[in-house]
């Protein structure tokens, strides 16, 4: 009898958490955390509590390079590190985690099915809108109430509702500026890191 022809082994799906990929995630978490400490005050309309940082660029890049699940985990780890020195009972860090997740999930999921720069550009634009809308909700129902609690029930002498009414435009513009800035930096770094990752075979 002749030996049966060996059937080709189908392509195996990539393992999600190999040592190499975990190391890659750890590096991006460290970079994101370190850069997030370099905050730039952006007191729009007198909102002195608004501070801009670009740490999430590395989280968004990770979402395209490895996938949305890895990016959300990395974001959670980064915000957990920031919680250690938080002065807001981790409310700001929790809000940032929610906002960042809202920003990156749609772009990174769609990118799985269509990997090109056009997909990145269009979906990041949508992500900016989603992040800004989520930020308004997070500030109204999470950050402002927590800060009011920390400062004896008021923010700058105002109730939560009054403070949000006074600062919502500043919050909207701030988060729009932040998400657009992160999108631009992501687009500038995306191609180089994508090629680098291919060489690493992660």
PLM regions and their residue ranges:
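Loop-helix junctions at membrane interfaces
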Residues: 1-202
């Amino acid at each position: 009898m002749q030996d049966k022809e060996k059937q080709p082994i189908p392509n195996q799906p990539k393992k999600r958490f190999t040592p190499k990929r975990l190391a890659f995630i750890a590096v991006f978490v460290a970079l994101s955390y370190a850069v997030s400490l370099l905050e730039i005050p952006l007191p729009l309309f007198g909102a002195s509590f608004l501070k801009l940082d670009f740490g999430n660029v590395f989280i968004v890049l990770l979402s395209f390079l490895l996938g949305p699940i890895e990016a959300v985990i990395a974001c959670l780890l980064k915000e957990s590190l920031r919680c250690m020195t938080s002065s807001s009972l981790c409310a700001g860090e929790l809000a940032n985690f929610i906002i960042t997740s809202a920003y990156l999930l749609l772009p990174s999921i769609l990118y799985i099915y269509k990997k090109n720069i056009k997909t990145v550009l269009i979906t990041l634009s949508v992500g900016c809108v989603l992040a800004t809308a989520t930020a308004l909700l997070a500030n109204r129902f999470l950050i402002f109430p927590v800060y009011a609690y920390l400062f004896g029930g008021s923010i700058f002498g105002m109730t939560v509702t009054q403070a949000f009414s006074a600062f919502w435009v500043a919050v909207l513009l701030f988060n729009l500026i932040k998400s657009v800035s992160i999108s631009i930096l992501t687009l500038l770094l995306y191609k180089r890191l994508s090629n680098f990752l291919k060489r690493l075979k992660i």
